[in-house]
Regions:
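Short, contiguous alpha-helical
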Residues: 44-48, 55, 65-108, 151-196
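Sec/Tat signal peptide C-region and signal peptidase I cleavage site
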Residues: 20-24
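Bacterial N-terminal signal peptides that target proteins for export
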Residues: 1-10
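Bacterial N-terminal signal peptides
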Residues: 9-19
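Short, helix-capping/interhelical loops that line the mouth of catalytic, cofactor-
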Residues: 25-42, 87-152, 184-196
Length: 196
């Protein structure tokens, strides 16, 4: 009969003991999940990214292009930026039930809102205030409430879906503004070659 190496025996015993412990651990009841703000963290990270891009694009497009529109009946540069802010307030109201501050003049007539100014500085302030409103509202969001049903713009959906739709709306209209910028020979700042 051959003698087994003590090292081999020790390795096999260790593996066997490890498997036994792993099975025992797997049978233990799971610890209660810690309070999480995972959605909030993810959402705010995505919001920061799209906000920086939108504001940098608004900065890059010259004031004399803010009345430009690709064709009659389509939003102009200024109207599209204001529409972004309108959506920020509208989706936030839909998710939280809280109306935007009275002094912003938000209402149900988005065409009137979109056409309220073509002044670049005013539009930037409006955009920044709308992003601040979204961010402040998101800080109160709890993961446990995200499946709560709400009605937004006549549609029943979860609170989570409203926040996701807000991000979708931001990206849709950022893309619109990118097309407008490029049609006017403005390169989106984040697309410029590095170092020059």
């Amino acid at each position: 009969m051959k003698m087994r190496s003590p090292l081999l025996i020790a390795a096999v015993a260790t593996l066997g003991l490890g498997a036994f412990v792993a099975r025992a651990e797997a049978k233990k009841p799971a610890a209660p999940a810690a309070a999480s703000n995972g959605f909030q963290t993810d959402f705010l990270g995505l919001l920061d990214d799209v906000q920086k891009k939108i504001l940098s694009l608004e900065d890059a497009i010259p004031q004399d292009k803010f009345k430009w529109r690709p064709s009659p009946g389509v939003r102009s540069v200024s109207e599209a930026f204001l529409h972004i802010a309108y959506g920020n307030y509208g989706f936030t109201k839909g998710a939280t039930g809280k109306a935007p501050p009275a002094d912003v003049g938000w209402g149900t007539d988005h065409a009137k809102w979109d056409a309220k100014t073509t002044d670049k500085a005013e539009i930037k302030k409006t955009l920044e205030a709308s992003f601040d409103q979204v961010r402040a509202a998101m800080k109160d969001v709890q993961d446990a409430d995200l499946d709560k049903k709400v009605n937004v713009f006549g549609h029943d959906m979860t609170e989570r879906a409203v926040w996701m739709a807000l991000l979708g709306h931001l990206n849709e209209h950022m893309g619109q503004e990118v097309a407008y910028a490029r049609a006017n020979n403005v390169v989106p700042p984040w697309s410029m070659p590095k170092g020059g």
